[in-house]
Amino acid sequence: PQTTDNWQNTEIEGIDIMLAVDVSTSMLAEDLKPNRLEAAKQVAAEFINGRPNDNIGLTVFAGEAFTQCPLTVDHGVLLNLFNSIKGDIAQRGMIEDGTAIGMGLANAISRLKDSKAKSKVIILLTDGSNNRGDISPLTAAEIAKQFGIRVYTIGVGTNGTAPYPMQTYAGVQYVNVPVEIDEQTLTQIAGTTNGN
């Protein structure tokens, strides 16, 4: 089948925004309902729906990072790709598990660095402490600053313990595991780039 589209050139002075979303297995913890990843996806979807004039893209990361969706004003496509993210992406071996915050930021920076938008922003949604990757989160924040990119950080989860699904020979069992958010690093990342 073929379709034709009538394209219109419109000039919108929007913002270019990359969402950098942690998809590590720790995002399956259920201290937020139904779990951290789904809670983060709900917040991000509301954000996307509230920004109709902005280019928005999506980077996902665990032990490594990749672009799920480049910058686009087609938020329907973006939301479909966003909703397709499943919490077991690292468990299934699609990407290395862990939390490589610096790599997630670096991937998002690479999508924004050449942007001509009046404002360039990364929104980082993560639950944990950096424990993987070749680039530290603070180094990535310095690079973002050099390109005029502001980083806003959102810590997803609580400190303490949380129910976490563990695959066993008998099926999925829930175990309470210690969880924490490295709020100091998230604050430093945002502060370095004049974000929040």
Give the ranges of each region predicted by the language model.
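Membrane-embedded segments
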Residues: T3-K118, I135
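Hydrophobic/aromatic beta-strand patches that form the interior of the parallel beta-sheet core
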Residues: M18, T59, I123, Y152-I154
